[in-house]
Amino acid sequence: MQAALPHLKETKGNIINFASGAGIQGHETQATYAAAKEAIRGISRVAANEWGRFGINVNIISPLADSPGVQAWAKAQPEYYEAVRSKIPLGRFGDIEQDIGRVAVFLASDDSQYITGQTIMVDGGSLMLH
């Protein structure tokens, strides 16, 4: 992000980083992953605070999506996958393009010009249950 700062100052650009509910929820056995994702949220919030005066918005998407990694996990541990899926209020993992992508497009657009430093949970409502 620091390397892009001079260009972003000129263009008043948007930064969209990706985090994970693993850090927010504290999933067991995921300490290293959760720490890395929370570091992304932390540095993003600092950048939002420091760079807002330059017209740069910095936000974070925390998705729960049907990614290739999730599909591999579903094949390896179908019972656990189904247990997690069944607890998502909307009943499914998000579609990468239709669900997650549209939020990213919104955050990159002028329609989100007054949103910065926020973590947008795109997880079918699963985090609200914890």
Regions found by a protein language model. Name each.
Residues 1, 36, 44:
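Active-site helix of classical SDR
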Residues 1-10, 48-49, 109:
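Amphipathic alpha-helical dimer-interface segment in Rossmann-like NAD(P)H-dependent oxidoreductases
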Residues 12, 25-31, 53-54, 91, ...:
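Active-site loop immediately N-terminal to the catalytic Tyr-X3-Lys motif
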Residues 20:
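Residue(s) in the substrate-gating loop at a strand-loop-helix junction
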Residues 25, 116-130:
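Short C-terminal tail/terminal secondary-structure segment
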Residues 29-38, 94:
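Short-chain dehydrogenase/reductase
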Residues 41-44, 51-67, 71, 115-122:
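Conserved Rossmann-fold SDR core element
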Residues 53, 60-61, 79-111, 115, ...:
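C-terminal helical subdomain
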